[in-house]
Curated annotation (Swiss-Prot):
Name used for this protein in its record: NADH-quinone oxidoreductase subunit N
EC number: 7.1.1.-
Catalyses which reaction(s): a quinone + NADH + 5 H(+)(in) = a quinol + NAD(+) + 4 H(+)(out)
UniProt keywords, alphabetically: Cell inner membrane, Cell membrane, Membrane, NAD, Quinone, Translocase, Transmembrane, Transmembrane helix, Transport
Gene Ontology MF: a single term: NADH dehydrogenase (ubiquinone) activity
NAD in keyword set: yes
Membrane-spanning residues: 20-40, 49-69, 88-108, 117-137, 144-164, 178-198, 219-239, 260-280, 295-315, 323-343, 351-371, 394-414, 429-451, 474-494
Database matches in InterPro entries: NADH-Q_OxRdtase_suN/2, ND/Mrp_TM
Keyword Ribosomal protein among UniProt keywords: no
Subunit organization: NDH-1 is composed of 14 different subunits. Subunits NuoA, H, J, K, L, M, N constitute the membrane sector of the complex.
Length: 513
C-alpha cells in the first residue's frame, strides 16, 4: 500500500536536493542562458542576429568558469545517485561547451542562415539546450537519467536538423532523424527495462554490484545488451546503426551537421564508456565474457565494421558533406578501438581522439561553409580551382583533411597514434585491430585528398560560380587560420591535451588499471 512520506523523510529529501544543487551549477547557468536568449529574441526589435550570436558566445564562455570550479569538488554521486561528478564528466562538459561555441561561430559565418532565418534566438537557445542535455548525458549514473538526458539531446537535435523549414532536404533530414531516433530510443529503453527486471536497480554502480553478486540469465542479458548497444550505436553513428547519418548530415544546415557529427557523437561515447565500464562487472581480462556476453567481440564488430564501411563507401561520394558524413562513421570506429582496450590508457586515447576530432572536423566544416557562401554548392566538382581563388581556405581545408587522415604533423596523427599504441600495448588480437585501423586510414587518404586535388590541380568547370563570389570576411579568415594553426600546434606540442585526457580518464565507480 502506498504511503505518503513522513515529515522527516521530506526534510531528508529537501536536504539532499540542497546539497546536490552545488554540483549542478553549470547546467543551471546554461538553462538560465537558454531562457534569456528566448526573452532577448522576443523583446529586442529589428535585426539582432549579431547581438544574439555574441550573447550566446559570451554566455557559453561564462559556463567554463563554473565548470572550472568543479575541479575542486569531491568526485561522487548526488541527486540520489542519479548524477555523478568526476574528471570524466568534467572533461565532457568542457568539450560540449567548446562544441557549442564553435557551432555558434560557424553559424555566424554561414550566409544561408541570413537568407533562410529572420530570427536566430530560438536557434541559439536550442544549441544551448543541447549543451545542457549532453552535459547531463556525461554525468548520468542512472538508467532513468540516461534516457531523459538522451531524449533532451535528441529532441533539440531533431529541431536543429530541420531548422530550414522551407528547405526540402532539411525537412527530410529532420524526419529521418526523428524516425531512426524514435526506434533506437524504444529499443534502448526496452533493454533498460530488462536490466531493471533482472537487477531491480537503475543506478549503474548498484547494477554492477547486483550482477557481480547474483549473476543473471545469459540469454536475457545478451538480449538486453544488444538493445542497449543499438541505442548507443545510433548515438555515435556506428555500423550497423548508422543509416540515419549520411542523409541527416547532408540535409541539415552545415553548422548543425558539424555540431551533430562532433558533440552528439562524443555524448554517445561518454554514455557508452560509463555504461560499459561501470554497469558491467569489470575484469582484468577484457576478452573474458561477462555474464555470458562477449562484450569484447560485440564492440570489435562495431569498430571494424564502422572503419571499413565508412571509409569504403566514402570513396564514391561527390557531395563534400556526405563524404564527411561517411568519414564520421569511420571515425566512430577509430574511437571505439580505445574503448575496446578497457584500461586507463585506452580511455585516455579515446578522450584525446575526441579532442582531435573536435578541432579538425569543426575546422573542415567551417571551410565548407565559407566555400558554400562563395560557390553556392557542396559538390566536389565545384571545388575545382578554389586553391587559387581562395588560397587560405584551400590551405586550411588541406590541413584539416590531412589531420582527419591521421598524418603528421597534425593533432589527428597524435590521436590515432595514441589509439593504436594502446592497442599494441595489449598485444594479441589487439595488434590486428591496430593493423586494420592503419589500413583503413590508408583508404581514407584517397577520398580526403580528392578535395585538395580538385582545388589545386583541376581547372574550374564552366558552370561553377567559384570565381565570381566574394572572399570570406576578415574575421572568418582569421578564425579559420587560428583553427588551422591549432591543428598543427597540438600535433607538435600535444602534452597539455594528453595530460588533461589522462587526468580525465578516472571514472567514478571504477578505477581502470
Amino acid at each position: 500500500m502506498f504511503e505518503l512520506p513522513s515529515g522527516a523523510e521530506i526534510q531528508s529529501i529537501i536536504a539532499t536536493l540542497k546539497a546536490s544543487v552545488g554540483f549542478f551549477i553549470p547546467e543551471i547557468y546554461l538553462s538560465l542562458l537558454f531562457m534569456i536568449l528566448i526573452v532577448v529574441d522576443l523583446v529586442v526589435k529589428g535585426r539582432k542576429s549579431t547581438l544574439l550570436s555574441v550573447f550566446s558566445l559570451v554566455g557559453l564562455a561564462g559556463s567554463l568558469y563554473f565548470i572550472y570550479q568543479q575541479h575542486a569538488m569531491q568526485a561522487g554521486e548526488f541527486f540520489f545517485g542519479m548524477y555523478v561528478l568526476d574528471g570524466f564528466a568534467i572533461f565532457f562538459k568542457y568539450f560540449f561547451v567548446l562544441s557549442g561555441m564553435l557551432a555558434v561561430v560557424i553559424t555566424m559565418a554561414d550566409e544561408q542562415f541570413e537568407r533562410e532565418i529572420s530570427s536566430m534566438g530560438e536557434y541559439y537557445a536550442l544549441v544551448v539546450a543541447m549543451v545542457v542535455g549532453m552535459m547531463m548525458m556525461a554525468s548520468s549514473s542512472d538508467l532513468l537519467m540516461i534516457f531523459l538526458s538522451m531524449e533532451l539531446v535528441s529532441f533539440t537535435a531533431f529541431i536543429l536538423a530541420g531548422y530550414f523549414k522551407s528547405n526540402m532536404r532539411s525537412s527530410e533530414a529532420a524526419l529521418k532523424y526523428l524516425i531512426y531516433g524514435a526506434v533506437s530510443s524504444g529499443l534502448m529503453i526496452y533493454g533498460f527495462s530488462l536490466i531493471y527486471g533482472v537487477t531491480a536497480q537503475t543506478n549503474l554502480i548498484a547494477i554492477s554490484r547486483e550482477l557481480a553478486l547474483h549473476g543473471a540469465d545469459s540469454f536475457v542479458m545478451l538480449f538486453a545488451a544488444l538493445l542497449v548497444l543499438a541505442g548507443f550505436g545510433y548515438k555515435i553513428g556506428a555500423v550497423p546503426f548508422h543509416f540515419w547519418a549520411p542523409d541527416v548530415y547532408e540535409g541539415s544546415p552545415t553548422p548543425v551537421t558539424a555540431y551533430l557529427s562532433v558533440a552528439s557523437k562524443a555524448a554517445g561515447f561518454a554514455l557508452l564508456m560509463r555504461f560499459v565500464y561501470v554497469a558491467l562487472p569489470h575484469t582484468n581480462n577484457v576478452q573474458a565474457a561477462t555474464l555470458g556476453i562477449d562484450w569484447f567481440t560485440l564492440l570489435v564488430i562495431l569498430a571494424v565494421a564502422s572503419m571499413i564501411y565508412g571509409n569504403v563507401v566514402a570513396l564514391w561520394q561527390k557531395n563534400v558533406k556526405r563524404l564527411l558524413a561517411y568519414s564520421s562513421i569511420a571515425h566512430a570506429g577509430y574511437a571505439l578501438l580505445g574503448v575496446i582496450v578497457m584500461d586507463k590508457l585506452g580511455t585516455q586515447a579515446t578522450l584525446f581522439y575526441l579532442l582531435s576530432y573536435l578541432l579538425m572536423n569543426f575546422g573542415a566544416f567551417f571551410v565548407v561553409v565559407l566555400i558554400a557562401n562563395r560557390t553556392g554548392s557542396e559538390s566536389l566538382d565545384d571545388y575545382r580551382g578554389l586553391g587559387k581563388s581562395m588560397p587560405l581556405a584551400g590551405a586550411a581545408l588541406t590541413v584539416f583533411l590531412i589531420s582527419l587522415v591521421g598524418l603528421p604533423p597534425t593533432i589527428g596523427f597524435i590521436g590515432k597514434l595514441m589509439v593504436f599504441s594502446a592497442l599494441i600495448a595489449k598485444g594479441s588480437i589487439f595488434m590486428w585491430l591496430a593493423l586494420i585501423g592503419i589500413l583503413t586510414s590508408v583508404i581514407s587518404l584517397y577520398y580526403y585528398m580528392l578535395i585538395p586535388l580538385n582545388m589545386y590541380l583541376r581547372e574550374p568547370v564552366q558552370h561553377a560560380s567559384s570565381n565570381t563570389g566574394t572572399q570570406p570576411r576578415l574575421v572568418a579568415q582569421l578564425f579559420m587560420g587560428a583553427l588551422m594553426l591549432l591543428t598543427i600546434y597540438f600535433g607538435l606540442f600535444f602534452a597539455p591535451l594528453s595530460d588533461f585526457a589522462r587526468y580525465s580518464a578516472s571514472i567514478f565507480g571504477l578505477q581502470l588499471q
